[in-house]
Amino acid sequence: MSAIKFNPSSFRKNFKWFENNKNWINFDNAATSIALDVVAEASKEYYQYFCVNPHNKNPEINQKLIAIIEETRDLLAKFFNAKKNEIIFTSSATESLNLFAFGLSSLVKSNDEIILKEDEHAANVFPWVNLAKENKAKLKIIKKTPNKSWTDAFLKACTPSTKLLVITATSNLFGNSIDYEKISKHLKKISPNSFIVVDAVQAVPHHKIDITSANIDFLTFSTHKFYGPTGLGIAFIKSELQSRLKPFKLGGDIFKSLDNNFKIIFKEGPSKFEAGTLNIMAIYALNKQLKFMQKEFNFSEMVFYSKQLKNLAYQLLSQNPNIVLANHDQDVPIFAFKHKYINSADLATFLNIKKIIVRQGSICVGKFKNKESFLRVSLLHYNTKEELLYLEKLLKTSKNSIINELIY
């Protein structure tokens, strides 16, 4: 790995997790990243100094908290090159995707096409399957042909009847990415009234995303995948579409008025989609996290380091005689593979004994449920060359040695 400005050793010093879990290696970062210390500290700070409800807008403490919430919205908008009023707080990316599907239910008609690919995460399948069934829309599940990319498959699948295109920017299982900007430009030309949804959960830690340039309508990610707090999702909805969508949840502070005939007049902007009390503690912690990362680290350098990790991991795994990679078009350091002689469940147990955290199974991808079991290694910026070399050494362990380790 060539010398770069980003220093993973320095970055690791911002995570007490490594002190508290000495000798452990976390290679399951696509499931949840380790949270920065500033996130834990901010969580404690919120409960000790704030812990009030922002729906009460008069007290001074509440006003400070409201300002922090709106500042966080602004920080996210700048990070993604979006408008502040296009950033909506949810509980997770899963909720965001359900929010999108429910909101679009009045805009997707019978025989409209909904396109998604066959190996999507379940959270990005079920809402659209349900929408297609309820609205009698045509659900088009696309497959990738040999020697062609997913981008090519999406471009080929688009027609003037396509109403909704659902894209996972980066696969949680295979680590390959899709050129959603290219697809968006193509689709909007042949079907101007179509909508594009992007699941960016795995892309956000590894790619710079420009929502405005990409001309997408909906996007989501979860903060716990990028060193942030759990229980918080970020949903982007293009401002000009918000008035056309039904809110997924109904409750306090989302409406302007309710007349005698129970007709609801909703508020404009994010408030329409943020019923009830938000996860204020998580938003507060995210605010501190974003400011800390902007001050201390250059995201472009982090993206470059991510590429270096991916290249090294691919080199080590692809050259290992015991390992069969599921694919060879990874764009980020997420790898699914099988061992030639040891099943994935046993291999995961063996690595756990050696204090390496990995993921085993179909990894929430419905296509492989009860069919194939992979072992997944997913890396983030605190992972190191030394950790990968240790993994390589273990994966070269003989079959008999692994079996003996499991038995005894």
UniProtKB/Swiss-Prot annotation:
Enzyme's top EC category: transferase
Cofactors named for this entry: pyridoxal 5'-phosphate
Record EC number: 2.8.1.7
InterPro entries associated with the record: Aminotrans_V_dom, Aminotrans_V_PyrdxlP_BS, PyrdxlP-dep_Trfase, PyrdxlP-dep_Trfase_major, PyrdxlP-dep_Trfase_small
Modified residues (N6-(pyridoxal phosphate)lysine): 225
SUPFAM superfamilies: PLP-dependent transferases
Keywords, in A-Z order: Pyridoxal phosphate, Transferase
Catalysed reactions, as listed in the record: (sulfur carrier)-H + L-cysteine = (sulfur carrier)-SH + L-alanine
Gene Ontology terms for molecular function: cysteine desulfurase activity
Membrane-spanning parts: none
Role according to the record: Catalyzes the removal of elemental sulfur and selenium atoms from L-cysteine, L-cystine, L-selenocysteine, and L-selenocystine to produce L-alanine.
UniProt xrefs under PANTHER family: CYSTEINE DESULFURASE (PTHR43586), CYSTEINE DESULFURASE 1, CHLOROPLASTIC (PTHR43586:SF8)
Family that this chain belongs to: Belongs to the class-V pyridoxal-phosphate-dependent aminotransferase family. Csd subfamily.
UniProt-recorded name of the protein: Probable cysteine desulfurase
Name of the gene this protein is made from: csd
